[in-house]
A protein has these predicted regions:
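Extended recognition/assembly regions associated with phosphoester-bond processing machinery
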Residues: 1-520
Length: 520
């Protein structure tokens, strides 16, 4: 699943999910969490932007959200039989991309949203992979993939995407970096609530015959990731604004497009960075002569080129990636597709035939996690993420850690992911209903503790009872003023969204407060 799965265990988890109160539903995940129901098939998912983020945060490195339902964590690579699967959770926001994971319970209103913004450090780990993967999954689409499919068909049913498309702000920079590095046979995403297929032919790009449009977002990538003020909050896409209609790939006939669902309510009442002024005549400038007299410390630091698209390493040889996004679940919607996937990754030895495959750790990925474990900080907005030192720095470190993984985990036969799910938070109590006050406490997940112990890395997610209680008594940090409700139509958890791109009353007046049922 590519999500939003909304892995809500109880009513308090709903208070940590970026969905307006009047649209919240408990759903049925809690039944799988409690064991009342079981999934018929192994299910793997990444996180999106409508999640019980406090629950998924317990499983930052990946783990079982419920029996048979495996969350990939913020970023991950796992194996399932002959397949090697990479995943990246969250959605793009240039403002938060290079920040640390500063959110920690109890959350303020801005934390509830920023916690699911993908971070550069997590993306950086994926960019160290040097061998082929078969499948990549993300919630947000990789930026630029829209140019490789039926773009006109997409814009016919999602016309509000055109502004972001023309300004190079559509979709995820992080997912594109991962896609271009990993080049899997398949990449699956969700987020826009529409079926869309595309093909990325890297052989054309290497020969210089690729689409010129692919280069357009690349410049914007560097602008988004290097500037502290993004033009707007790029991840907040009008998913339901025009009603949800499946869009076909280039090969599909146009008559399969259905009329829009006018009764559907948009839930992405998210923060938007204010559009910058187009004119900057009032900003004072400094002459180059005066700049030359300043000490070297006043010079602008060189741009970080680590996000530049580099040639793939020899171990990544696939040239064709098939991209597929599906609609959200619902009647007469294209939300399910069955595919036969032929592995393109190489294995040192063929796996013996098995009736059922079990998830396994990935040797290279575990080595990467050991290299980067000390760089992870939690709950501190003032912390600085260590800079990207580039592949030449990380490669020998990763190779050394691979030798450790081989000796300590591969050879002893410890690479199968244990089915060690345990309840942490209480299960849902229907007698209490869903409108409960307060946020849940923080839980130290035994799966994360076991994983960190296995890898012999620090576990910053574990806190003593005294630390948890002290944070709860202190309460949330002061809120970011961008998220204080009432100052404009999209503020906080208040207001509706109109069909126009305007702010304030236009957005709130057109769709807000109509009492329509929310469709996920």
């Amino acid at each position: 699943m590519l999500n939003d799965s909304q892995a809500v265990r109880n009513a308090q988890d709903l208070n940590c999910m970026a969905v307006p109160v009047k649209y919240r539903q408990i759903g049925d995940f809690h039944e799988y969490y409690s064991g009342a129901r079981t999934v018929p098939y192994l299910t793997i998912f990444v996180g999106g932007n409508h999640e019980a983020s406090n629950h998924l945060w317990e499983l930052y490195y990946g783990g079982w959200a419920a029996p048979g339902i495996y969350y990939m964590g913020s970023a991950n690579v796992v194996r399932l039989g002959p397949l090697r699967i990479a995943g990246l959770s969250g959605i793009w926001n240039g403002r938060d991309y290079k920040k640390p994971h500063f959110e920690r319970l109890p959350y303020n209103s801005s934390d509830v949203r920023s916690i699911y913004h993908v971070r550069e450090l997590d993306t950086r780990k994926l960019l160290q992979i040097r061998t082929q993967v078969d499948i990549g999954i993300s919630h947000d689409w990789p930026r630029g993939v829209e140019w490789q499919g039926d773009l006109r068909g997409l814009l016919r049913v999602k016309p509000y995407l055109e502004d972001d498309l023309n300004n190079g702000r559509l979709n995820s920079v992080a997912a594109k970096l991962a896609l271009d590095r990993l080049r899997p046979a398949y990449w699956f995403s969700a987020h826009h609530h529409v079926k869309f297929a595309a093909t990325i032919d890297y052989s054309k790009e290497e020969n210089g015959s690729g689409s010129q449009k692919q280069a357009v977002p690349e410049e914007q990538h560097r602008t988004d990731t290097q500037q502290g003020t993004a033009t707007k909050n790029e991840e907040e896409i009008d998913l339901d604004l025009d009603g949800e209609v499946p869009v076909t790939s280039q090969a599909a006939p146009p008559e399969t497009l259905k009329s829009s669902n006018a009764d559907e309510i948009n839930l992405d009442l998210e923060d938007e960075d204010e559009e910058p002024s187009q004119a900057h005549d009032d900003i004072p400038t400094v002459s180059e002569d005066l700049r030359a007299q300043l000490p070297a410390a006043f010079s602008r630091p060189p741009a970080n080129t680590s996000t530049e698209q580099l040639p793939p390493p020899p171990g990544i040889a696939n040239k064709l990636t098939r991209f597929l996004a599906l609609d959200k679940c619902g009647a007469n919607r294209s939300f399910l597709q069955i595919l036969d996937v032929k592995p393109v990754s190489q294995h040192s030895a063929p796996a013996p035939p098995q009736k059922f495959f079990r998830l396994e750790y990935d040797k290279e990925w575990l080595a990467i996690l050991r290299v980067f474990a000390a760089d992870l900080t939690l709950g501190d907005p003032s912390a600085q993420v260590p800079p990207d030192r580039g592949p030449a720095h990380y490669l020998p470190l990763i190779e050394a850690e691979e030798a450790w993984v081989e000796a300590n985990l591969v050879q002893p036969g410890k690479m199968v992911i244990p089915e060690n799910f345990e309840l942490t938070a209480p299960v849902y109590d229907p007698t209490m209903g869903i409108n409960v006050q307060g946020q849940p406490r923080e839980y130290s997940n035994p799966q994360t503790r076991a994983f960190c112990k296995m890898l012999q890395i620090p576990n910053p997610f574990h806190a003593t009872e005294e630390e948890v209680q002290a944070r709860m008594q202190a309460g949330p940090r002061p809120d970011d003023p961008r998220f204080e409700g009432g100052h404009r139509g999209r503020g906080g958890f208040h207001g509706g969204r109109g069909r126009t791109r305007g702010r304030g009353g236009n957005r709130g007046g057109n769709r807000g407060g109509q009492g329509r049922a929310w469709q996920r």
